[in-house]
Amino acid sequence: MSQQLPVRIATRKSPLALWQAHFVKDALQAAHPGLEVELVTMVTKGDIILDTPLAKIGGKGLFVKELEVAMLEGRADLAVHSMKDVPVEFPEGLGLVTICERGDPRDAFVSNTYNNIDELPQGATVGTCSLRRQCQLKEYRPDLIIKELRGNVGTRLQKLDDGNYDAIILACAGLIRLGLEDRIKSSIEPEQSLPAVGQGAVGIETRLNDDRIRALLAPLNHPETAHRVLCERAMNNRLEGGCQVPIGSYSLIDGDQIWLRALVGEPDGSIMVRGETTGPVSDAEELGTKLAEQLLNDGAKDILDRLYADA
């Protein structure tokens, strides 16, 4: 009988969160024909507090706490996350067990008037809620005015359309998944702006002692994506980076080798600490940790200490 119990997915109500939940539901049912899967929708603190910068209210962990409580209380079996939004640490008993194949990891330049960052006039206003995007934009174009931008994807696009910004920066993956790729004027290559840790990947969190759910999820794991994301997260973990710190990273796998590039920056773009490393895929997490140590020694510690002191 236990095999016939429905699998319950905890999800926020935003269009992108629902897309991710349905994506995992469809993948589970494709892997296990006849499996019943239900969505359990809920509102998180991050969905309610929209008038305060994320960095001031605890970062993007605000978007997952309610989902985690539902799993711990047995009201849901798993939660689906954009990996760029997943906190470094999990509550006791929960963990990340599956990482699905990565989508487009790049940032998207979105504007109704301009085609790319270079076309923006002096002093143009760009919307983003990400310190990572802000520091890289300000390094490249110190003249730009960065303005806070909160809300789901549709809300952010509407604020652009209302004339509040000359351009906004979003994640390519989110726009593509919502069928809004026509809003992308240009994709920003990692060489110009490093993405967030895990950007473009979808991860699944569940109870670590739930063998049935873990077995059902196993076919959804994409090993190459998992190695890349775990490498990036190991770097972020050593830096003690939450979701609202100016940390960027990007990894690639070629054969049995993994390459990782990362940065930590002052929010105003005045100081940028960069590094890269390569090594065996089997050492992915160790490589991420070692690169973080290098960044800390090269000045990232001072940047992060100042940020955390101001938080």
Swiss-Prot record:
Keyword set, alphabetical order: Porphyrin biosynthesis, Transferase
MF annotations from Gene Ontology: hydroxymethylbilane synthase activity
Modified residues (S-(dipyrrolylmethanemethyl)cysteine): 243
Catalytic activity: 4 porphobilinogen + H2O = hydroxymethylbilane + 4 NH4(+)
Tree of life domain: Bacteria
PROSITE patterns (UniProt xref): PORPHOBILINOGEN_DEAM
GO biological process, one term: protoporphyrinogen IX biosynthetic process
Cellular-component GO terms for this entry: cytoplasm
Functional pathway: Porphyrin-containing compound metabolism; protoporphyrin-IX biosynthesis; coproporphyrinogen-III from 5-aminolevulinate: step 2/4
Cofactor note: Binds 1 dipyrromethane group covalently.
E.C. number: 2.5.1.61
Family note: Belongs to the HMBS family.
Purpose of the protein: Tetrapolymerization of the monopyrrole PBG into the hydroxymethylbilane pre-uroporphyrinogen in several discrete steps.
Subunit record text: Monomer.
HAMAP family listed in its UniProt record: Porphobil_deam
Protein name (record): Porphobilinogen deaminase
Biological source species: Aliivibrio salmonicida (strain LFI1238)
Lineage of the organism: Bacteria, Pseudomonadati, Pseudomonadota, Gammaproteobacteria, Vibrionales
